[in-house]
């Protein structure tokens, strides 16, 4: 019996983006780390991401060693010498674990509320919701043809086979038509199937993107949507942008037609079994009612996505509960999460800092993931699902995602305005809903349902009045010459953004993107829009 150590992460979903995980050292990692510390071996476990990776040398400790005599069966006969391993150092964080968990759950609840409202208002359609459950692998379409598939799954699969054959026939029609459609003439459905075909050829390195002459006139027509896939692929063959060695064709003697036939055959053969092509087919089955909302809801129970409930299952089956009300209830109760749907919005982040010490007390990235399933030997199936997940849970939305900061930027604009004497704390600016001084006539968030009327600085911050800060951005742009100048306004905004450190990384000990400050449209930049692109950190 041999003892071994494993990493066990508590409350993994809340902390995974911060802590990261460990794993077996790769050849490249070994070469890099062994060059620094020759005690590394090819059997070591190391930090792969997050704090585990950043503090690898601190957490590592030292390997133990035994010199032994063994018999011909490899059994130890005598221990010649032994060195005990030494544990690495402990790492203490400023994070408040309870606050981290609460923040994660509140953030998820807030995002779920927005998704729920968007569905109720019609901004997200129920067909989008039903397909999202398939597209993001919540409903596993690969189980539909299993021997023990349910009657519902079998019915859906039978319908799918019919529609898949029709989709492949649509492709073949275009590939061999004497008058094929250009991309701009196609339906959205057919264009999706064509897009799949071209992406497949790229991903399999059959279409050699590095060889494509982007200035080529035929390629330009393709880019503009004014060429059929048949004409484009024929041109790719002629220009030798196709690696024919990867096709089932005699590369020495094949002519253009034979190569084209092999290319089309490759596409349609792959489409028969490709999961991404299947999802394109399901995408159009849902709005065409070839797979129903009721079927999807029943499958959520049958595949164990939701805890089985006999009463609810029966009511769904007999129509007492409608699929839409069922799904809305599950979203409202977060039994189906925003991350599972991966509809907009499905991600978020929040950082809470102690203003007295500067310590970070919570740093949440939503959605999280179970880093236990990546440590101590990767769960390959789970890792594949993470990589396919449309909500991208391995991306740290707190430190890596860059977005327009929006109204939080207004405090910086206020500081710039006060410091450059275009504002005073008592100056009042009229909010009448629309800012008329620039061509795009931006509006206040309260317009057209109302206006803020006269606002001073304190009330403008309280109400987050866009007009007040549009005016401040405009006044910064006229400060030097009395004439509006974009560059002058942007220079002032960049100056104060730099003073606040927004153009630099925060220095956190995990992967972090570098924010960029707006370079145009100071009126919009003043409310955190324009091309401001800033991380939460």
Where in this protein do the model-derived segments appear?
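Non-catalytic accessory/assembly modules
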Residues: 1-51
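Amphipathic alpha-helical blocks
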Residues: 57-65
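Zn2+-dependent metallopeptidase catalytic core
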Residues: 107
